[in-house]
């Protein structure tokens, strides 16, 4: 039963999780239970509410699909890549992240538990924990790309959720799971981070280049702490 915004988000997520399994590594039916609190023979709703659809993209999809996403990606001016907890990164992994950073207007937000150190990385934890809610407005991205496990930054998630109307959220997950910490997840890329960053770096438009504006916005504020 949807009584408010949180209920709506939760139901949207559950329905997306269920329907996305219809053709996920095989096909088959799904069953969705809907509570009915009273009997009624009347259904007079002419227009159903608009809901969010979460797409799943995998390496076995046509390459044209990935190029379409690369074209969209090149048009974003403020891309926040959030690295959650990870075990380790190989040299090849870091090289792919750096190639991506050079091609797109982004920064890579890391924490100690991210275990990622390479070009484009910023330790954003001090800034997110010290900033007031209103200060995040200028730093708010128009695209979030997240990967890894839990994000330790206590205040970052609430700040992101408070500005969820301003951005799109892509998640990288090797199992294709829906993990919607922003309340705004739109696309799940079922692949490794290395595949994702390498693929988009290679499919970037020829003239695509990080102008460093968004990176410098975060870096300058961090230096002021």
Residue ranges and their predicted role:
Residues 83-170:
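Glycine-rich, anion-gripping cofactor-binding loops and their flanking helix/strand elements
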Residues 77-79, 142, 186:
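Conserved acidic residues
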Residues 77-89, 215-219:
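Active-site donor-nucleotide binding/catalytic segment of nucleotide-sugar enzymes
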Residues 34-40, 85-87, 113-114, 176:
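Glycine-rich beta-alpha junction loops
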Residues 1-2, 123-132, 186-200:
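Short acidic-hydrophobic, aromatic-tinged amphipathic segments that line or gate anion-handling sites
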Residues 1-27, 202:
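Conserved thiamine diphosphate
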Residues 162-225:
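Phosphate/pyrophosphate-binding active-site segments
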Residues 17, 21-75:
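Conformationally flexible catalytic loops at phosphate/diphosphate-handling active centers
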């Amino acid at each position: 039963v949807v009584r408010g915004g949180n209920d709506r988000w939760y139901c949207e997520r559950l329905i997306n999780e269920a329907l996305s399994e219809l053709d996920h590594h095989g096909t088959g039916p799904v069953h969705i239970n809907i509570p009915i609190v009273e009997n009624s023979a009347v259904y007079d709703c002419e227009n159903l509410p608009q809901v969010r659809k979460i797409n799943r993209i995998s390496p076995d999809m046509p390459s044209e699909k990935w190029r379409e996403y690369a074209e969209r990606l090149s048009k974003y001016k403020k891309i926040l890549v959030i690295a959650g907890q990870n075990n380790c990164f190989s040299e090849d992994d870091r090289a792919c992240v750096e190639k991506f950073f050079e091609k797109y207007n982004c920064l890579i937000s890391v924490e100690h538990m991210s275990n990622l150190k390479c070009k484009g990385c910023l330790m954003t934890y001090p800034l997110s924990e010290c900033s007031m809610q209103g200060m995040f407005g200028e730093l708010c991205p128009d695209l979030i790309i997240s990967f890894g496990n839990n994000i330790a930054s206590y205040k970052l998630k609430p700040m992101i959720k408070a500005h969820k109307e301003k951005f799109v959220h892509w998640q990288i997950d090797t199992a294709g799971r829906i993990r919607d910490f922003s309340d705004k997840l739109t696309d799940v890329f079922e692949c490794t981070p290395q595949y994702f960053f390498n693929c988009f770096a290679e499919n970037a438009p020829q003239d695509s280049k990080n102008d460093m504006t968004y990176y410098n916005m975060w870096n300058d504020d961090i230096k002021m702490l």
